[in-house]
């Protein structure tokens, strides 16, 4: 090793530093080369093609979107996922419980706070059958809707006919005692 300092080029032999527009061009060229080396440009082009049309520089809520995506976004924003899912189950009731049971038992309402699905049957025999199948049915509903959506299946028998007036009506009575089918 020698104690002599390294030779530095003299200031008069330096290349001139770019300024203004030239400096901007040099910086842009360097940024493009670095992005190309990382692969960002190709990735951005793929994302632009996938993303579709946009209304401005960034994607926002006003951009065009598919109807299904817009409905899903609305359900998520309003917190309607569970009621919408239960409504879907009420529409798909025959596929979930089977054709025989669906002919005789119909879902009436869903209490979101208590997570109780109320089902009405057209005879006491079918109501008893559904009460026996309730644990399996709750498990199947939770499998379709998400865990814990339905905690209890409330089974109601058939509604008796309303007999408020007529020759067989006793004044002050509470109605028919046993008219279940």
Swiss-Prot record:
Name it: UPF0232 protein SAV_4320
What family does the Swiss-Prot or TrEMBL record give for this protein? Belongs to the UPF0232 family.
Q: Where is this region: Disordered?
A: 1-64, 156-181
Taxonomic source organism: Streptomyces avermitilis (strain ATCC 31267 / DSM 46492 / JCM 5070 / NBRC 14893 / NCIMB 12804 / NRRL 8165 / MA-4680)
Residue ranges with Basic and acidic residues bias:
30-39
- One Pfam family from the UniProt entry? DciA
Skewed-composition ranges (Polar residues): 1-10
Name the InterPro entries for this protein. DciA-like, UPF0232_actinobac
